[in-house]
Amino acid sequence: MMTEATKVLYIVVREEGDDDDNNGDDSFRYTRPVLQSTLQLMGCKARHAFKISRRVFELIRSEGSCNTSPENGKEPEFAKEVGGSTCVEKLNCLVVAGDVDKNKSKPFEMYKRRTTVVVSREIFVDVVCDALAEYKYVGRDQRADLILACRIRERKESVTVLLCGTSGCGKSTLSALLGSRLGITTVVSTDSIRHMMRSFADEKQNPLLWASTYHAGEYLDPVAVAESKAKRKAKKLKGSRGVNSNAQKTDAGSNSSTTELLSHKQMAIEGYKAQSEMVIDSLDRLITTWEERNESVVVEGVHLSLNFVMGLMKKHPSIVPFMVYIANEEKHLERFAVRAKYMTLDPAKNKYVKYIRNIRTIQDYLCKRADKHLVPKINNTNVDKSVATIHATVFGCLRRRETGEKLYDTTTNTVSVIDDEHRNQCAANSLTSKGMFQVIQRQGSSRRFMALCNTDGTVAKTWPVASVGKIRKPVVNTEMDDGTEHQLHKAEPVNLQFGHFGISAWPSDGATSHAGSVDDLRADIIETGSRHYSSCCSSPRTSDGPSKELMEEQSVNGSDEDDEEGDDDFHEPDSDEDLSDNNDERNRDEIGSVDEESTKSDEEYDDLAMEDKSYWTDNEEEESRDTISMVSQNNHNEASKTNKDDKYSQNLDLFLKTTNQPLTESLELTSEYRNRMGVAASDKAKMRKRSLSIPPVGKHGSIIDDQILANQTDSVL
């Protein structure tokens, strides 16, 4: 009788040396969605994570298939044979007679046991690494990254991401997308904590708690606040000058004369800080509970003042803070239109617009605190870029935390490690914004190098790629390029964890700067045996991307009283030049927004898989993978620029003609352009949602411009 393969729905990963008497205390049960989220956490693209997780379950089902009967009382277990060619060799079906009667009364429990496979940690990691290799993922140490991601997913470690920022900067949207990307199900807003606290206090008893942060200063006593600040300032001056009669006289005179009231902007900041201090105590207790349970969480809110965040980091080592802001005031103001009842920017009908000066003042204050404490600042004009930057920075901090580094420096009251990791990510993204990655291998050599290729096809930088030894441990090639000419044997495209941000994991000191001409290499070329690897030297491209310079004043005392001194001279700048980046870079960033695919949930990738089978063959799917092809971009950019100018002139001439000519002539123009669009329309039918990166300029010109032109002629009809 023919037996059918076991259906695998669960993979139980058991630690080495864990026996059956532990009742699975050290084991963890993986499903496909859980494994997919784990792969996304370590930097795999969402669609690749979906397919890799499916591949892992297929490998386990195919390599360890056996016929299990309904009477089986325990899960099947994988055993690795010594000297086997594959990491999963056979599946042993363990039957325990004592559990048969007990499981008969639980039909679902019997089904779950039949579809569950127990594997050791080493075998599980080997299978996943093999699946990653099939999808051309190359990392500095993927095995360590996978183990780290598994520890986070299995709640053996935790991370707490704090998104600070004022109202309207996109913290809520960013936290939701970031939670989906990291696989974190707990996303908390400080507004919800404040709302919970309001249920214990009446509005008349505590009007400060019931006010919004941007006008909480209206509920403070200006005289009391001014006197309190004057006393703190005098106390600090007294401590710095020393105790002497002249200093005491000076301080006494200053105390009597510095009773003038604070400005409106300073009162707005004081009200914001007062309400934040009320909320931060409850947040402190919540973070303590989350860390005890090793539960990862994303916290966002305006109440995360950087002064109090530094105090939280002294107690909670899992915190990774970020400062989210909007540099462009006009775009910040436009975000508040959707919050009004009538979609208006009228201050009389939109309270956010009414208090926009207070909101911007609080943002400037937070940005100053972020620079002082070296907290990474995220200009959230492009949501996709912000999520990718935070994701790569968080995982980079987890890597460094695994090595024993402390994210918070108690001596300087700064987070220089997080800032350094963030600057590395920005530098990597800037370095590789126009680069292409391929793994190259020279003729007669077993060593492989990951090469960063420029747009003209020259190799700007190479890194030795780690190979896997007989014991399946990464072996890093330490031999460097000597600059001599070699024949290029192989060149294949690769995927990096976190995309272009992933290059930050490769040490810069281990890279070579020897470049060679590989203009004719394309992404689909595997064998190029006669290609020569020129020793023509070109220096690596240096990073000119946005990076936050180290502040001169790094020694900061962490008390709130010390931070009050800088608030006395606080004033809002007339322009946002100190907060904004380069105009060209800012305009480029603001083009992007939330991508259609970036908001997809894990379940929606089942539909994507169906689309893959319906519209694409295996060859087309392989060619459409997001690997970077070796195409000369210079010629392409020149052609696209010329075509764009020509299309613009044609569209303008057609528009002027169609506005004055009769209907019959418009019909002739419409049919003519529809005929020209025939080939382009047939090609466009094969396009998918995730092929947005394909340039619109092709053999027949700009598809986008032609479509607009067709719509324009249709409107004339």
UniProtKB/Swiss-Prot annotation:
May be not required for the accumulation of phytic acid in seeds. Phytic acid is the primary storage form of phosphorus in cereal grains and other plant seeds. It comes from Arabidopsis thaliana (Mouse-ear cress). Residues 243-259, 532-545 have a biased composition (Polar residues). Disruption phenotype: No visible phenotype under normal growth conditions and normal levels of phytic acid in seeds. SUPFAM superfamilies: P-loop containing nucleoside triphosphate hydrolases. This is P-loop NTPase domain-containing protein LPA1 homolog 2. Residues 559-582 have a biased composition (Acidic residues). Residues 235-259, 532-629 are annotated as: Disordered. Signal peptide: none annotated. Residues 583-602 have a biased composition (Basic and acidic residues). PANTHER family: P-LOOP NTPASE DOMAIN-CONTAINING PROTEIN LPA1 HOMOLOG 1, P-LOOP NTPASE DOMAIN-CONTAINING PROTEIN LPA1 HOMOLOG 2.
